[in-house]
From Swiss-Prot:
Any one GO molecular-function label of the UniProt entry: structural constituent of ribosome
PANTHER family: 30S RIBOSOMAL PROTEIN S16 (PTHR12919), SMALL RIBOSOMAL SUBUNIT PROTEIN BS16M (PTHR12919:SF20)
Organism: Treponema pallidum (strain Nichols)
Gene expressing this chain: rpsP
Designated name of the protein: Small ribosomal subunit protein bS16
Cysteines paired by S-S bonds: none
Amino acid sequence: MSLRIRLKKLGSKKRPYYRIVVQDAREPRDGRAIEELGIYQPIAPKGTEVSFRLDRARFWLERGAQPSDTVRRLLQSRRGSVLNAVASDERRVASSQQAADLAHVESVSCAAPIPSSPGGQGV
């Protein structure tokens, strides 16, 4: 199940109001949400249009949820930049995994010689 963090549209005509939600990527825009993370009111005064729980956003990003382009922009505009923190954590984990894989490959290659041909005779 691939998860998306995206906007769920509410409000009336010419008065949009959005909820920032975690949904299965196959759900329709206004479909069932797994969790509501916050709100986005594009018509509200500057500085009050976005409010969401950064800790829960980071929780879902660490578990592989992909933000939509608009939600990515909103997350980056918030202080603390949740996306940068998650990306640096992922890079740190990936580099440690690569180091472990490299050490394993080196230990295996030193332990056993590679056979030259299946029958033991050269072709």
